Amino acid sequence: MKYDDLIQELNTWEYDEKIYREYYFMKKTPEKVKDFVKSHSDHELEVGWVLNPELLHQNAGEDEFISEKYNVSLVKHPRYLPVFYHEHDFFEIIYVLSGTCTNSFRDSTEKLTAGDLCLLAPNVRHGILAVEDDSIILNILIRRSTFMDIFYNTVRDKTQISGFFVGNLYSREKIRYLLFHTKDDIVIRNYILDMYREQKTSDSFSDRIICSILTLFFVELTRRHGKK
């Protein structure tokens, strides 16, 4: 698939997104909520999440979100899903392909716009909210061991990114996240779309190819946007 086709596919509305959007804009009167639940009775899970977002995973392990045969997983964050605070034991990249989102922490909130990229350390409590129709937010979930392998093999210069690696692997005072404003950097965008496309291929070679692309991604991110 071409890049434009991948973006068009990602922009397609999933049914759960339609449910979340409807609830976001509707008046929350008891009657309206009752009608809402009834009209989506065949999607109890999604309705439960939108009514009680605290039911979503608050503490997640790698194997809950990353398939056993993969080291990396790319997931589109649903538009209009109510914000829920959670943490997990793997690394995460939040990339804004288009539109905007907010990423909230215990003591601060970052507003991300198209091209922004947030590199998030494990066990950092946060919540994401994307409430614009044109928002496409990709979450890249990376096993801790995979992240370490990439660091040892590629990211060795004294840059902001290498400091993030070292701090989270060895230091008591960890860097919670790094924020990059890549703006309209097509190189960075295309590496992410390449990983997404390969995940769709899903054959016996896909995991190795995705990990290789991820390695190139981090090297290019360091070269093009890493602060020394």
Identify the function of each model-found stretch:
Residues 120, 163-164, 170-171, 212-222:
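Short amphipathic alpha-helical patches
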Residues 179-228:
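An amphipathic alpha-helical interaction segment
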